[in-house]
Amino acid sequence: MEGIFSLDGYKLNKRIYINLQKVTILTAHNDYYTPVIIFDLLDSYFNKKDFSDTFLNKGVFVSLNEKKLNPQDLIVFRLRPTVNLENELKITKKTILGQILNQKFCEKQDIYNKVLFYLQKDIISKLDEELINYGLKSQIVEENIFNFAKLIEIENYIDENPVFFKEQDQYLAKSLIVNLINKLHTKKSKLLLCELPEYALKEDEYKKFLKTLKQSDNIENIIIYTNSENTNTIFRDIYTYHIVKENSVLGFDDYDRILGLLIEKYNYRKSETEITELIINSIFFEREFKQIFENIDENII
């Protein structure tokens, strides 16, 4: 999905517009509140968390290229600043691992038959031997992975040594979740909301993780909220970036006009490529970024 992604309602002060790309990056210039509201809105709207009449009455509106999106149109995943693997790797209907295992389970009908055969032969039949004396008989009501999952416990190992999930390296934890999301096959488009604060990963881990996101071809759209200057070493497309300030999200969808104004400002001494590099390199440094746009149209960015 690509185009103008529009959001309104909930706790937003006004309608915002995002130039949605394969990877879209939000960075805050003195507005660290709006990006979190955007993620909360999308997470709640598409995952129906606390989705009630109260939420609807707040005038929530989500559209792509002026076409309204309904809650069932997308599958939204959210990667928070710190990943709790213990929660993420529970086998339930809402977790990534649960959805993947259920998909694998349903794809192979012979698994059903094998499970039912041994369940009937080794457990149900023996139970019925006791129950028949009382005019009772047992039966399997439903066969699905989530019932069998109660017998499964996920453990964490590093070099064959068990470790607590909370001790797991955040880079490995985040990479694992992204890879699972990437492997999940769905009929609906997937949107990953990724919060990447500066403190969670080391510099080299951060860059490697961004490459993992960039190479996740089976995730249709990824929105990253970060203020780390290391981001622009991996993503060099100007249209990827959005500045969040004063309750607004400002992108570069009108970049031809922006470029024209800046070429005039620099008296044609800088090429289009040089100006683009200048903007991308300064985008995480608010003061430097403002200096580039001094003395031109204040409303442009």
Question: Where do the model's predicted regions map?
Answer:
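Glycine-rich P-loop/Walker A and Walker A-like loops and their local beta1-loop-alpha1 context
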Residues: 2-76, 80, 84, 88-98, ...
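Conserved catalytic network of the ASCE P-loop NTPase/AAA+ motor domain
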Residues: 18, 183-186, 214-218
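Structural motif
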Residues: 27-31, 193-199, 225-228
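Structural alpha-beta junctions
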Residues: 44-52, 212-224
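Conserved P-loop NTPase mechanochemical-coupling segment
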Residues: 101-172
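Conserved helicase/translocase P-loop NTPase motor core
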Residues: 153-192, 197-200, 204-205
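Conserved Walker B catalytic segment
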Residues: 198-219
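The catalytic "switch" region of P-loop NTPases
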Residues: 215-222, 226-278
